[in-house]
Amino acid sequence: MKALFASTARGLEELLKTELENLGAQECQVVQGGVHFQGDAALVYQSLMWSRLASRILLPLGECAVYSDLDLYLGVQAIDWTSIFAPDATFAVHFSGLNDTIRNSQYGAMKVKDAIVDAFTRKNLPRPSVDRELPDLRINVWLNKDTASIAIDLSGEGLHQRGYRDRTGQAPIKENLAAAIVMRSGWQPGTPLLDPMCGSGTLLIEAAMIATDRAPGLHRTHWGFNGWAQHDESLWKEVKTEAQVRARRGLSEYASRFYGSDNDARVIERARTNARRAGLADIITFAAQDVTNLTNPLPEGPTGTVISNPPYGERLESEPALIALHSLLGRIMKNQFGGWNLSLFSASPELLSCLQLRADRQFKAKNGPLDCVQKNYRLAPTQPGAAPAQIAEDYANRLRKNLKKLEKWAKQEGIECYRLYDADLPDYNVAVDRYADWVVIQEYAPPKTIEPEKARQRLFDVIAATLSVLGLAPNKLVLKTRERQKGKNQYEKLAQKGEFMEVHEFNARLLVNLTDYLDTGLFLDHRIARRMLGQMSKGKDFLNLFSYTGSASVHAGLGGARSTTTVDMSRTYLEWAERNLRLNGLSGRAHRLIQADCLSWLAESDEQFDLIFIDPPTFSNSKRMEETFDVQRDHLRLMKDLKRLLRRDGTIMFSNNKRGFKMDHEGLAALGLKAQDITQKTLSQDFARNRQIHNCWLVTHQTKD
């Protein structure tokens, strides 16, 4: 009997133990990442040929204490390597683990290699050669703290490499993990199996191999025992011949079918090629088809199992499409696959919740570094006339109500960009803005009292409901997370796409960028204020401070302003403003753009203007102020500088987003100015639910009696 070790992915150890016991293994002991077991020479070959779950089969040779590199060298050399492989065989060393002495795995591998080579040369035998790519024998050394475990890797390459798949491209799951997913899915061989997002077909091919009694090692051409001195070629041939006979018989007797589809025709062709290599092309049907068009291949029965490893995203921008995909999949399952089983493997439990299905069983496993879950669902038979379950029903109803009210209004007003929803319901703390045929969802950062998982689930529900209510394609939805802005956060880039789209606001054409920044280039709540500026600007010199992308300057120019002066500290936004002006035929000396700190420029300028628009930040750092700028604290100083630039009959439109802002009327009067609160006049229908979104004032010189 030989002591052996089978490694596997985390979470599959118990499943592997059962598999090895069924092959005849004895004294199986589960440890993290694998199973220790005992077996004779026949079992060694049986486990290599038939284990669908093991990553590698190792034959331990011994252990040694490692307190220095010399300890490692001597411990390895103590093994009788000349009885393990011949000097004309090639070998390679795989070393993993570090300690205080061996701090580099390459150095550890070199010391092991030196010890093995020296074991031959000290007996006056030829020096064996190293072949890192395809050695005759692979030595595995694992250093755990101060103990090195030395073993022969009888697998050679990982056992997940069955020989049917092209290894050039990245695959989302390895074959042994795919086999485990199939085993845990509840699918029974002899019943239909469908994968609607099959990729290169791994899940279906592994299932077909199980169903037709085809050994996973049957198509492998290279093994780690080729150079092992104790290798029994005749015994190995017996194991291989038996596997070939069983595979032929299993395929000829199998009556059911497997179905796979994917939206990428090139991937489907690769899946067909893989199935041909595996000898299973005759029982697997592949089709290039999007999940949107998925139908039950056997509507009259029999029932079977749907299995898949659907895509998941690590980037926020990919989530809307994935949420839509999972929501759609859930609806299709309920509508077309009643009575079937469904099993999905995912790194995102939140996405699986978008199915709106209750799982009967679930399993955990590691897919490389990712913590994953497999959930099995029993799909109830479809009831005629049953109403589909709604996601985030309260939110969906409110959005539907707002849409009915605002869509007609926006069309009459001649605007394409407006707010559909603004945290109307406390459980759904988002803003939803429409930009022509696009939608931007901004998630306000949830309070710390809300569990992150619950907040994330609500966001997923909002996205799914928004897509459903608006009938929106997932690629037309942009998701952002908004927090209270401090300092320069509002200028920080989120992405680098550089994609601009043109929208219409009354008679103005404006460019917005929905992805690259937290804001889009157009403050929707100032829409009425911009129209008022256009109506007030005819024949006037117009100044736009803290101009952002210059949309107010565009409206003033279109309203007939004699000149526009647009000032902002950001070169990016000034270039954007210039594009906006040119888009509307506004260019030349009459339309100046100035890059400057607005407060410093204001303090130094001696120009005169008839109409000034200023929308300063609530708080910022500024060279002009000794420390900071606070709009509540410093608005009188701001007005003092603005007064100097304002002509006798001129008007300042002053706006800010400070909640609870109080205008210092007495201080203004002392400056010879007066202010009229026009906030309510500047709030359009889409912001009627949030009357504190901004405050807006008209400031003029006091008239003398």
Curated annotation (Swiss-Prot):
Q: Which GO terms describe its molecular function?
A: 23S rRNA (guanine(2445)-N(2))-methyltransferase activity; RNA binding; rRNA (guanine-N7-)-methyltransferase activity
Is rRNA-binding tagged as a keyword?
no
Top enzyme class, one word, equals: transferase
- The record places domain THUMP at 43-154
- What keywords are annotated for this sequence in UniProt? Cytoplasm, Methyltransferase, RNA-binding, rRNA processing, S-adenosyl-L-methionine, Transferase
| PROSITE patterns (alphabetical) | THUMP (PS51165), UPF0020 (PS01261)
The main place the protein resides is cytoplasm
Q: Which reaction does it catalyse?
A: guanosine(2445) in 23S rRNA + S-adenosyl-L-methionine = N(2)-methylguanosine(2445) in 23S rRNA + S-adenosyl-L-homocysteine + H(+); guanosine(2069) in 23S rRNA + S-adenosyl-L-methionine = N(2)-methylguanosine(2069) in 23S rRNA + S-adenosyl-L-homocysteine + H(+)
Q: Which InterPro entries match?
A: 23SrRNA_methyltr_KL, DNA_methylase_N6_adenine_CS, RlmKL-like_Mtase, RlmKL-like_Mtase_CS, RlmL_1st, SAM-dep_methyl-trfase, SAM-dependent_MTases_sf, THUMP_dom
**One annotated Gene Ontology cellular component of this protein:** cytoplasm
Give the Enzyme Commission number. 2.1.1.173, 2.1.1.264
Keyword Iron appears in the UniProt entry: no
Where does the protein end up? Cytoplasm
Summarizing the function annotation, the protein's role is:
Specifically methylates the guanine in position 2445 (m2G2445) and the guanine in position 2069 (m7G2069) of 23S rRNA.
| Family of the protein in this entry | Belongs to the methyltransferase superfamily. RlmKL family.
**Annotated PANTHER family:** RIBOSOMAL RNA LARGE SUBUNIT METHYLTRANSFERASE K/L (PTHR47313), RIBOSOMAL RNA LARGE SUBUNIT METHYLTRANSFERASE K_L (PTHR47313:SF1)
Q: What is this protein called?
A: Ribosomal RNA large subunit methyltransferase K/L
The gene that this protein is the product of is rlmL
